[in-house]
Amino acid sequence: MPTTPLLLAALAALAALAVAAYPSCSPGPDPSGKCQRLASTHSATCVDLHLRTCADAAYNHTSFPTPLEHRSWEAVEASPEYTLLGVLHFLLEGQCNPDLRLLGCSVLAPRCQGGHTQRPCRRVCEGLREACQPAFDAIDMAWPYFLDCTQYFAPEEEGCYDPLEQLRGELDVEEALPSGLPPTFIRFAHHSYAQMVRVLKRTAARCSQVAKTYSIGRSFEGKDLVVIEFSSRPGQHELMEPEVKLIGNIHGNEVAGREILIYLAQYLCSEYLLGNPRIQRLLNTTRIHLLPSMNPDGYEVAAAEGAGYNGWTSGRQNAQNLDLNRNFPDLTSEYYRLASTRGVRTDHIPISQYYWWGKVAPETKAIMKWIQTIPFVLSASLHGGDLVVSYPFDFSKHPHEEKMFSPTPDEKMFKLLARAYADVHPMMMDRSENRCGGNFLKRGSIINGADWYSFTGGMSDFNYLHTNCFEITVELGCVKFPPEEALYGLWQHNKEPLLNFLEMVHRGIKGVVTDKYGKPVKNARILVKGIRHDVTTAPDGDYWRLLPPGSHIVIAQAPGYSKVMKRVTIPLRMKRAGRVDFILQPLGTGPKNFLPGPSRALPRSLDPQGAPAQLDFEPPRARRQPASGSKPWWWAYFTSLSPHKPRWLLKY
């Protein structure tokens, strides 16, 4: 055939690529002619480890050349293997991270100690491959060659080390607990980062049918932002099941929320297994995401000062000295500008390109990508330093930015959400003179954020103006870093408010928007007359609209369809969302019958330095499988690596 020379040339090129991609035999071929396994240890010159992706490895020194024959930091950082480690948490939706990343680091930057390099243990690799292979299969990605458990990892008898020992570290206190403790036992103590990750992973393993952990990104110093999720089908969005998140430790020195969310995770797991009907109903009808520590780097600084320290600033910022609750895009100023113009939408406001010119923390980026990926309905951010629940807006509409009551269009609903927490909190309702934060008692321990003090760049305002999510801020107490003996009391005071708040996600209405053929309509608008704030449908056409009791006129519309209007009545004591579906009819050739609004959909301005724009932060499992001969969706992450693209990740 005429193409035979071309095929031979292509095969030769692929063979050359394979030789370049895989390290040579070490120390040499055995008598049978096969490649001998790498030695478990060998002499080397140890150098300091300088890889940001591997900054949280359990060792500080490595050596060159590496098992992949990289001979400099530049070669490692330019390699597709290193690029893969940096994006694994996005590709796998946080599954198996940071475990897989640290396993990869043990090959790309081998441990060097006392003039000898050491190989990681094969059993660790095999255990991770068994657990994580389904995650790779789900996105049609081959298992990375450099994580070959036979070639790059050593058996126990040859001497090896556990590359995940950092995750298993600092467990002496947990392991020393007496055996035979009841499954409901919770240790009310402060948790280091390693202990926190371990507790979350243990909890997810214990309740694997309803829980899993994942990472949404990494802090500036490389710590994974670990989330534990609870759902009847963990890892996937279910039709009309609302999504809710709780975030702690956005300020590193405000630690009560961090610990309370660790306790809450254990409580939900234990009570579910014990058959608590309230918890089982909650987990079977709600997808709950708990992020105990948004600022683990700041926590380390605060923890070094010790519990009880109340200096108000030590560890507050992240490692870049950025206040994360002032680091989000200021969409509130844009809202005030748009609100003065009739017929212009004031919801789902895009992020200005100017925002990316400033200093944006990796923790902030991780949160923004997270809430653009999952259709969150409700959220709370847990803080410390006072005893009050505040709600948006946090930025004042006063022309001189002074504190001033600045309500959102959903003022009534936000007050209901805030009261759902405060009204069942014993200390927030305490009328004694010794009560912390007593100046809020006359307000019912709730306040509009801007009426308290005004600031821009807050996370709550961003949630409301950029997405469908309603977020409140909970100040848990006047001591930012309470001593351990106070933690049990804090948990008891906040357990019922947290559960009551989580259940509030089932207030209002929910439903599905479809066309006349039953096909879901994505990004349809759900409008409520008298409330100038729309929500949009998720990819499956489902929506949730938090609403206070009363009568409402609800409208659904989408480009190319006629609008549909319905009147709904929400009873005062109704504790579950009413079902309101819409079937949209396609428009004819006449004038388009839309409600007043912008002439085009608001664009979503993405981080120009972040993930490829075509991915749009959708969950990997939502991607279509590639057509025959085309590349999978995740290939876009590696397009800049030509000619060294990781073709070894392709299955076909």
UniProtKB/Swiss-Prot annotation:
Signal peptide segment: 1-20
GO molecular-function term, one example from the UniProt record: zinc ion binding
Source organism, top-level taxon: Eukaryota
UniProt keyword annotation of DNA damage present: no
Tissue expression pattern: Abundantly expressed in the placenta, with low to moderate levels in the brain, lung, thymus and kidney.
A GO biological process held by the record: Wnt signaling pathway
Subcellular location: Secreted, Extracellular space, Extracellular matrix
Main location per the UniProt record: secreted
Cofactor(s) needed by this chain: Zn(2+)
Sites where the protein binds Zn(2+): H251, E254, H383
Pfam family, any one: CarboxypepD_reg
Induction, as annotated: By Alachlor.
Glycosylation sites: N60, N284
Domain FZ per the UniProt entry, residue ranges: 41-163
Alphabetized UniProt keyword annotations: Carboxypeptidase, Disulfide bond, Extracellular matrix, Glycoprotein, Hydrolase, Metal-binding, Metalloprotease, Protease, Secreted, Signal, Wnt signaling pathway, Zinc
SMART domains: FRI, Zn_pept
Family matches, as SUPFAM superfamilies: Carboxypeptidase regulatory domain-like, Frizzled cysteine-rich domain, Zn-dependent exopeptidases
EC annotation from Swiss-Prot or TrEMBL: 3.4.17.-
Regulation: Inhibited by 2-mercaptomethyl-3-guanidinoethylthiopropanoic acid (MGTA) and guanidinoethylmercaptosuccinic acid (GEMSA). Inhibited by chelating agents such as EDTA and EGTA.
Region (Disordered): 594-628
Record-level GO cellular component terms: extracellular space
Functional summary from the UniProt entry: Cleaves substrates with C-terminal arginine residues. Probably modulates the Wnt signaling pathway, by cleaving some undefined protein. May play a role in cleavage during prohormone processing.
Homology family: Belongs to the peptidase M14 family.
PANTHER family hit by this protein: CARBOXYPEPTIDASE Z, PROTEASE M14 CARBOXYPEPTIDASE
Protein name as catalogued: Carboxypeptidase Z
Organism of derivation: Rattus norvegicus (Rat)
